[in-house]
UniProtKB/Swiss-Prot annotation:
Full protein name: Fatty acid oxidation complex subunit alpha
Catalytic activity field: a (3S)-3-hydroxyacyl-CoA + NAD(+) = a 3-oxoacyl-CoA + NADH + H(+); a (3S)-3-hydroxyacyl-CoA = a (2E)-enoyl-CoA + H2O; a 4-saturated-(3S)-3-hydroxyacyl-CoA = a (3E)-enoyl-CoA + H2O; (3S)-3-hydroxybutanoyl-CoA = (3R)-3-hydroxybutanoyl-CoA
Region described as 3-hydroxyacyl-CoA dehydrogenase: 311-729
Natural source organism: Yersinia pseudotuberculosis serotype O:1b (strain IP 31758)
Physiological role: Involved in the aerobic and anaerobic degradation of long-chain fatty acids via beta-oxidation cycle. Catalyzes the formation of 3-oxoacyl-CoA from enoyl-CoA via L-3-hydroxyacyl-CoA. It can also use D-3-hydroxyacyl-CoA and cis-3-enoyl-CoA as substrate.
Active site (UniProt): H450 (for 3-hydroxyacyl-coa dehydrogenase activity)
Pathway(s) of this molecule: Lipid metabolism; fatty acid beta-oxidation
Gene for this chain: fadB
Length: 729
């Protein structure tokens, strides 16, 4: 053994060939600050070996390196910029030393080589992969860009076009695609990976492969003439702005950095990369996006803990077909849980089966399933007009019309037919679970399971705990949601639960703004373009359905009359009274026609302004700041109340529910991250200016206390101040 640390080992293989093996504690290798320092120490030993002829780099685990340790990111980002800069220079010196070894080097890639793992293999002369390998630089998805030379080496290895695509999108590539673009030199069966890597390395040692020629382009300027460069980078910048927009600066920064570095060799190009990385790392967007990644890990860990030792059901059932029931049945069948789909109406069953078939057809078109697989999945959905076989289902999801009497009757009816251990769940969006539980003899076996539309696309499932819901019931439903590929978040019962409870104050703020003379077109534009919502409030209401929103609004007003009751007609009332129900009947705040693919196309409708004139002040222009404040303050206050009342268990779960359930702009990170970025004292001061508008704008006491004590919702990560001093001996 030449060198051994907690994260990697260096030893001789044969005849002057050394092997560097990444083998950190735990299930995966990460390129954390400790591993980077250990790599430097290993190279320090290696550089002293006069008999060294070649180096093979591999992993002892099922993946090479999954990336940096993202749990360290916020601490790194909180370091003073000059400290972070020093550490990046230190880290890049190590990768340069790997690249500059006076012998050929090769990486054997099994599983993932992402982020820093990809940058590590780029520093070797050759790369060989097994078929399941995936290679990529996902940093831009986290609001940053490659920082260990990825933006320098990848374009010089592949050419600018392929490299820009990988870096700007953050998508990884398969082993076969990597071979096509020149990212790897060969793809071999897993059992032959190390042997083939060794063979290739020996060929390089014997002069049969020119390892110096393989290395040279990575040290030199990018080979592009001025015309090619102008075209390549102009097109890339245009695409990035179109896809990422102004709220996500990392992809454009990466493209501009690669462009600026194109005319330089490695040293100057790496300096430019570091100079671009540091400001991105200090940005609010990076903190928010890294926060989402960490929150996602936390939420998934909570689900795993809640359902520990509980298997997903072998058979499920959905009561109520149609689009929603069909969507739930499809998702269940797709993820290998057979499902009974029961309805009292043959047409609804047809609609449900057609929805499942349509979604499977899309999978077929994309090559995700073949015809045989599609048929076998569809065969695991059993449509029925009666309850035959329902007693065999372990979890039953009620998804009938959003009417408390109908839901209660259906739940009581099915409970009489099933065993004492069968779990019942209601896919209700607003009706309190405890209200529905009154119709049941075994309320401990009952909870809410709120799916979001469209089911196949929306990652969140709200699991609602009633007063009598047992832990066993929660565990079964969380296990089922997880098996379905969803992110379950457990919330406590109240009208609207969490997501809809906080959505309707936002929509109420919109309604008041229109009442006071706000133009809904301008409001939508500001909330989409400036704040970053995927849809403005008027457009969202059209998509949800004005009739659905009108009904839910009444439920919320009854549940929280002091804040959500209103003594005036608003824009939703006007649309509802005029039977403008949104996309479902082609007219709401906007008019809808179908495009060539049959998708709804939004158009302005002059009639709407005339209709709204009866309930609103004369049109006036509000500032962007006013529009954002008047719509967002009610939502933010309600989100905070939900945490203070224990409806949600943590800021992390609240923020993920908003991002996954409502499409809250990820670059803000969720309401709690947004508040921390804004500063609670600044928020309270801003909200105070709108307090005259009513109870929705009154800041909760807990948030006022946080503002007084200068507290945040997320712990502030201590800066890693000493990372740049971890120099090899």
């Amino acid at each position: 053994m030449l060198y051994q640390s907690e994260t990697l080992q260096l030893h001789w293989l044969e005849n002057g060939i050394a092997e560097l093996v990444f083998d950190a504690p735990g299930s995966v290798n990460k390129l954390d600050t400790k591993t980077v320092a250990n790599l430097g120490e290993a190279l320090n030993v290696l550089e002293k070996q006069s008999e060294l002829k070649g180096l093979l780099l591999r992993s002892a685990k099922t993946a090479l390196i999954v990336g940096a340790d993202i749990t360290e990111f916020l601490s790194l980002f909180n370091a003073p910029p000059e400290k972070l800069h020093q550490w990046l220079v230190f880290a890049n010196t190590i990768f340069n030393r790997l690249e500059d070894l006076p012998v050929p080097t090769i990486s054997a890639i099994n599983g993932y080589a992402l982020g820093g793992g990809c940058e590590c293999i780029l520093a070797t002369d050759f790369r060989i992969a097994s078929p399941e390998a995936r290679i990529g630089l996902p940093e831009t998805k986290l609001g940053i860009m490659p920082g260990f030379g990825g933006s320098v080496r990848l374009p010089r290895l592949l050419g600018a076009d392929s490299a820009l695509e990988i870096i700007a999108t953050g998508k990884d590539v398969t082993a076969n695609d990597a071979l096509k673009i020149g990212l790897v030199d060969a793809v071999v069966d897993p059992e032959k990976l190390v042997g083939s890597a060794l063979t290739m390395l020996k060929q390089a040692i014997d002069g049969k492969l020119d390892w110096q020629a393989a290395r040279r382009p990575k040290l030199e300027p990018l080979k592009l003439n001025p015309t090619e460069a102008a075209m390549c980078f102009t097109i890339a910048k245009g695409r990035v702005m179109q896809v990422a927009g102004k709220h996500y600066p990392a992809p454009l920064t990466a493209v501009k950095t690669i462009e600026a570095a194109a005319k330089f060799g490695r040293t100057e190009a790496l300096n430019l990369e570091t100079n671009s990385f540091v400001p991105l790392a200090g940005s609010n967007e990076a903190r928010a996006l890294v926060g989402i990644f960490l929150n996602d890990q936390y939420v998934k860990a909570q689900a795993k803990k809640l359902s520990k030792g509980v298997a997903a059901p072998k058979l499920a059932a959905v009561l109520g077909a149609g689009i929603m029931g069909g969507g739930i049945a499809y998702q269940s069948a797709l993820k290998s849980v057979p499902v009974i789909m029961k309805d009292i109406n043959e047409n609804s069953l047809d609609l449900g089966m057609n929805e499942a078939a349509k979604l499977l057809n899309k999978q077929l078109e994309r090559g995700k399933v073949d015809g045989l697989k599609m048929a076998s999945i569809l065969a695991t959905i059993r449509p029925t007009l009666d309850y035959a076989g329902i007693e065999r289902a372990q979890v039953i999801v009620e998804a009938v019309v959003e009417n408390p009497k109908v839901k209660a009757a259906v739940l009581a009816e099915v409970e009489a037919l099933i065993g004492e251990d069968t779990v019942l769940a209601s896919n209700t969006s607003t009706i309190p679970i405890d209200q529905l539980a009154k119709s049941l003899k075994r309320p401990e076996n009952f909870c809410g399971m709120h799916f979001f539309n469209p089911v196949h696309r929306m990652p969140l499932v709200e699991i609602i705990r009633g007063a009598k819901t047992s832990d066993k019931t929660l565990a079964a439903v969380v296990a089922y949601a997880t098996q379905m590929g969803k992110t379950p978040i457990v919330v406590n019962d109240c009208p609207g639960f969490f997501v809809n409870r906080v959505l309707f104050p936002y929509l109420a703020g919109f309604g008041m703004l229109v009442r006071d003379g706000g133009d809904f077109h301008q409001i939508d534009k500001v909330m989409e373009k400036q704040f970053g919502w995927p849809m403005g409030p008027a457009y969202l209401l059209d998509v949800v359905g004005i009739d659905t929103a009108h009904h839910a609004q009444a439920v919320m007003a009854a549940g929280f009359p002091e804040r959500m009751n209103k003594d005036y007609r608003d824009a939703v009332d006007v649309m509802f009274d005029n039977q403008r129900f949104g996309q479902k009947n082609g007219q709401g705040f906007y008019r809808y026609t179908q495009d060539a693919k049959g998708k709804p196309r939004k158009e302005n409708d002059e009639q709407v302004d005339k209709l709204l004139a009866e309930i609103s002040q004369p049109l006036q222009e509000f500032s962007d700041e006013d529009i954002i404040a008047r719509t967002m303050i009610p939502m933010i206050n309600e989100v905070v109340r939900c945490l203070e009342e224990g409806i949600i268990a943590s800021a992390a779960e609240g923020d993920m529910a908003l991002v996954y359930g409502l499409g809250f702009p990820p670059f803000h990170g969720g309401v709690f991250r947004y508040l921390d970025t804004l500063g609670s004292a600044n928020y309270v001061e801003m909200a105070q200016r709108y307090a005259h508008l009513g109870a929705l704008y009154h800041v909760p006491a807990g948030l006022r206390a946080k503002a007084e004590h200068n507290e945040s919702y997320y712990p502030v990560s201590a800066a890693l101040l000493d990372v740049s001093t971890n120099q090899p001996a």
